[in-house]
Amino acid sequence: NAQVLNIVLTEDTEVLNEVVVTALGIKKEAKSLSYNVQQVSNDEITRIADANFVNNLNGKVAGVTINSSSAGVGGSSRVVMRGTKSLNGNNNALYVVDGIPMSDMSAASTQPTDSYEGAGQSGDPISGLNPEDIESISVLSGPSAAALYGSAAANGVVMITTKKGREGRTSVSISNNTTFSAPLVLPEFQNTYGQTEVGSYYSWGSKLNTPSSYDPKDFFQTGVNVTNAASLSTGTDKNQTYLSLGTTNANGIIHNNDYERYNVTVRNVAKMLKDKLTLDLSFMLSSVKEQNMTSQGLYYNPLVPLYLFPAGDDFSKVQAYQRYDSERNLLTQYWPYSTSLALQNPYWITEHIKIPNHKNRYMATASAKYDFADWINVTARAKMDR
């Protein structure tokens, strides 16, 4: 009494015929390439908003490590493929936007040489892009994939393909993404023994009658990141237009660590001369304001005095971080501890040493492709980036 069941599985053509963007900016099936290309879609990039969208690649690409800086919200990130290749040089991958390498105008990150050096690391240039404008990201690793860009691509290539107008339809998209952040893991501190002497940072003194209630976690706040985006896409078989606006307003977990980004993007693609000539023009504006990026070193870093605050002492008294000096007729910092470690009141740092930074970036690109035949074409690209 056996019964035969015929089961037919539907092909998942999206997986079987996966299309990726190659080093030349040409779309090909992944299985036809002789080198490794991994692609990340826009949905994966924007699912959880980050002030720097590069951080959203973490865990999505095999063999790639995303090193986020500790500067705070909006800080720069490095994309390291298949391990560190240089101890002192730049291990970051090359970014290519719509077939054109992106110049890196960020300052090099170096370790401070003494206690009084150090500054918060600003966001890298790629972080100024609006993630909602990205169609997909292809990660190219290995010498074959990056050969087109020479030695600049020795550490790999991150190919970014931006959106353009859709043929035959008009669509409007509006989105909002709000995320919250808080410290996940903090160092553990003893609260049994007090200061060795008055004004000292060392907590190797006598046993406290009442365990210290000091908790560095009270210094931090809940971070908020609000991202808004609106876009318009329209087009015909001869002309496609894309327009987008984006805003990112974020507050870090340290007071006054603020980040604001405003983006405007316009792109137009047109076909001429019996569809043999394709012109692609785009303009991107990114305006970024940031402040109070956590510094390296000691003197400008609020975390070091926070963690070295002596157990058993009253932390609330340093929250009133300034006192009036009648002799100098001005407000001065209140920090009743030794200056041997070049530390300052953490509240004084966050309130008075904000180090604001304002960056405007303009990127205009133009490309022209002429098809001589079905099997041969010539493409020219130009870019202004300032």
Language-model regions: role of each:
Residues 55-109, 136, 146-163:
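Extracytoplasmic beta-strand/coil segments of soluble accessory domains associated
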Residues 2-46, 54:
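Short, acidic, small-residue-rich periplasmic hinge/interaction motif at the N-terminus
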Residues 3-8, 18, 53-55, 79-82, ...:
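N-terminal periplasmic accessory domains that precede
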Residues 221-240, 245-248, 262, 346-386:
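Outer-membrane beta-barrel transmembrane strands
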Residues 15, 31, 91-92, 97, ...:
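Surface-exposed loop/interface segments of Gram-negative outer-membrane beta-barrel transport/assembly proteins
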Residues 78-80, 157-159, 227-229, 263-267, ...:
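Membrane-embedded beta-strand positions in outer-membrane beta-barrel channels/transporters
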Residues 100-141:
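Short acidic/polar hinge/loop motifs at secondary-structure boundaries
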Residues 36-59, 65-71, 79-86, 98, ...:
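Short, polar/charged loop or turn motifs at beta-strand boundaries
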